[in-house]
Amino acid sequence: MSWTTDPRDVLRVTDDFDLAAFDRHGKPGFDGKKSDGEQVMATRGELLAELQERLFAEGRAGGERSLLVVVQGLDTAGKGGVARHVMGMVDPQGVQLRSFGVPTKEEASHHFLWRIRRALPTPGRIGVFDRSHYEDVLVQRVENIVPEEVWRKRYREINRFEEKLVASGTTVLKFALMVSYDEQAQRLMERLDRPDKRWKFSPGDLKTRAKWDKYQEAYADVFRFTNTEHAPWYVVPADRKWYTRAAITEVITRTLVDMQPRWPEADFDVADMREQLAQTMSTSALKESLDDTASTVESAIDSSIDVREEAIELRGDKKAAKQAKQQRKEWEADLTATLKQKTALLNAR
């Protein structure tokens, strides 16, 4: 049991998207149950972690690309769970997580995008926004914090901002987690019932819930006016937490596959550096390193090629399959040269 369809195809907002008719308990594109979804997510997480590390390495080497994941949703929709369970599968040093609550006094004194720009992911990193600049056309609209002529102008400002962001090398993924009215009530009640969850509850949650219809209208307009080719919206059913997390994992992974991050080439003479390092090692340490070289490097090659092959399967790219075979040959030739040099260095002792 797995994905029968690329979730990007079934979750992406279309021109005729109707939020009122959206099935918030569904699992579009997936034909399995919860245990299947959790297994697929865990397996895909290994690929996600490898791709994230490549993107991070690319950034360290001077690359300019990054990925921004925007997660929106009403209270209890599962935004925090995405950060913990999805991004928790990758190296935290490559992730920049930012949660946007009520603007501080300083933030409120600036343009609404000021605090967003300050939190954008740096090259090589994945940025995750728990709430975002869309609060300024959702909360500020429904709560009448700013007049209509102000928040209506923001749709266009957001589109221009995201277009420039993409042009600068940041891929933007926008997820709206849509929980049903009944499911939200169940989750809020659980927070009240459990002593260890009460810290998550606020009396204001009920005030927000009382404006459910207004928030649904605001979200519908967000999809209508800010769903663009360069930064599309993916609306995710949120009544099943496992599906929400699995779907977002799949979309992020497939997006990184399409980005094709690569391990950067060394900008120094590897053989020369190896020789200099060997001169600082004892004979026994150098021999131990030589003995471990083949198994260590072969394992790394196999792991990297496995990732490539899994990515190729997702993309269905025959040309990429040939490139993967060629890459294996090049790495194996490099290993042969490495073993030859280290053997010569050891024999020269």
Q: Which sequence ranges carry the predicted segments?
A:
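Glycine-rich phosphate-binding loop of ATP-dependent small-molecule kinases
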Residues: 1-349
